[in-house]
Amino acid sequence: MSMIAHVINPGISGVKLACAVIEPGQNPAFPSHLQVSLTREELPLEAAPDELGLDALAERILEQTAAWPAPDAVVGRGGLMGRVPAGTYHVTPELARYVLENVSGSQPADDPNPGIGAPLALRVAQARGVPAYIVDPQSVDELLPEAHMTGVPGVRREARFHALNARAVARRAAYEVGKQFREARVVVAHLGVTTSVTAFDQGRAIDTTGTAPDGGPMGARQSGPLPTRAVIRLLQTQSESELLRLLTRGSGFFALTGTADLSEIERRQEQGEDSVVQTAIAAFVHQVCKAIGEQTAALPGRPDAVALTGGIARWDAVVDRIERRLAWVAPFIVLPGELELEALAEGAGRVLLGLEGVREWTPEGVTLRPAAPLVQVETVEEV
């Protein structure tokens, strides 16, 4: 039995789309490891999604996907819904309205449109007569209570990290080392424009460095850890919004080398004569290794795998340095780029195939509907 999901992932310059054919896996020992075949397309945008309007954007998606096989569900990238457990969520008009109205003003450079995935998925799903889902939204929070605490009463560490991609990579890494995701310990380092390093224990992200502007090693544009007094001095010369932009978009390799183009930085590194690039790479590797060590220590035992993902994981020279330094920790699994389209499709597939229950969200809390094969849903009101 196969299922079809239409996948919607809004980005900086366009909307990534995919038609996913989802089938049960071939290994009965790993029933949740699905086989997913994606047909990918991109809908380029000449203006920001909020300027185009959600109705117009949904119409363009419907036009571009009109020739695709009819879906069993539409799945989009999630938004900020308060602190919620990981999983696949049924998109209702109430949820779609909430994520549109609760968009943080300090989104990192690689997460510009966190509020539109759910309402877009709902509009397209309503037109197709199928349910809409989101998977592992940005505000997933399953951290240990002590991981939230700081030494200052009232100041709390938040759980903002690359939840969708990191969980998908952790699942894949567990499978690669022969472990069920809900039995494995995995450390995932997402290395890209922004970064985060996260410890997964038995299917839960129990601790994380966070990502810009709250934490994580330096990235292509992310600052990495800063001394507190330096941040205080910076606030004396610029506004909060200016400082947030500096920490999330104007720092890291971009500030140190003059470019965030990783292929250009790699070219300069290979020439071996650019001391600025060599020093920046050394600092990056040092910070990533420290962060992996920190998250390893958050686990109740040795990890089964360390996984590297994100755009910088394509950079062999950097990956080799990290692996050599930390080879003693656990086997390394390298999954370059991002698996967001696959993660969205797989999350919908686990629900459609009855392998996992679907979560229902309201402002008052989250409930889990028991796992069951897909059933027809009733028509819901417009957002």
From Swiss-Prot:
PROSITE patterns per UniProt: ACETATE_KINASE_2 (PS01076)
Nucleotide-binding as UniProt keyword: yes
One term of GO molecular function: butyrate kinase activity
Keyword annotations from UniProtKB, A to Z: ATP-binding, Cytoplasm, Kinase, Nucleotide-binding, Transferase
Statement: the UniProt record of this protein carries the keyword ATP-binding: yes
Matches recorded under InterPro entries: Aliphatic_acid_kin_short-chain, Aliphatic_acid_kinase_CS, ATPase_NBD, Butyrate_kin
Alphabetized SUPFAM superfamilies for the sequence: Actin-like ATPase domain (SSF53067)
Xref: Pfam families: Acetate_kinase
Domain of life per record: Bacteria
Reaction catalyzed: butanoate + ATP = butanoyl phosphate + ADP
Subcellular location: Cytoplasm
Gene Ontology CC annotation, any one: cytoplasm
Top class in the EC scheme: transferase
One GO BP: acetate metabolic process
EC number(s) from the headed UniProt entry: 2.7.2.7
Family per similarity comment: Belongs to the acetokinase family.
HAMAP family, per the entry: Butyrate_kinase
Name under which the protein is recorded: Probable butyrate kinase
Organism: Deinococcus radiodurans (strain ATCC 13939 / DSM 20539 / JCM 16871 / CCUG 27074 / LMG 4051 / NBRC 15346 / NCIMB 9279 / VKM B-1422 / R1)
